[in-house]
Amino acid sequence: METDLQVVRVPITHPDAQALIEAVQAEYVARYGGQDESPIDPADFEEPLGRFYVGYLDGTPVATGAWRRSSVRALGAQVTAEVKRMYVVPTAQRRGVARRMLTHLEATAAEAGIEAMVLETGMKQPEAIALYTSSGYEPIAGFGHYRGSELSRCFGRRIA
């Protein structure tokens, strides 16, 4: 389903970004019993290290997505980026918003010279796993903060 999603680059500290990050953290509490505590440095989402985006439908912030350069080597790529903070508010789900955001992240990362995207998602997020696998992501070894976590699944995809 097509959407009229407007994807806007913003700092992670932007009020719309912060409101949506709070919403996804509440979702993590509901699903896992606690917030995502992976280390996040706002500078990781500024050039040249990464980007942060908010998606708007009819002027309303409904989604976030970001990428940051990563030291993870996967799928034969020398230059990778990690997808972070993918989230769509419940009222905008099942409308293609997440797929549009993911496509935007991949395109902007490729423009910045990224060869592959890597990411982590949780076992209690089957809709996220379905999005990533249907978008061509394949399982990779756990990495970083999530290495060894039984609730985490890591994926990667060559984009260049």
Placement of each model-derived feature along the sequence:
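Conserved amphipathic alpha-helical interaction elements at protein-protein interfaces in regulatory
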Residues: R94, A107-E111, E138
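Active-site acidic-Proline motif in GNAT/NAT acetyltransferases
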Residues: V89-T91, R95, M123
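Acetyl-CoA-dependent GNAT
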Residues: E2-K84, V89-T91, L102-H104, T108, ...
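C-terminal "cap" of GNAT-fold acetyltransferases
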Residues: E2, V10-H14, A112-V118, G122-A160
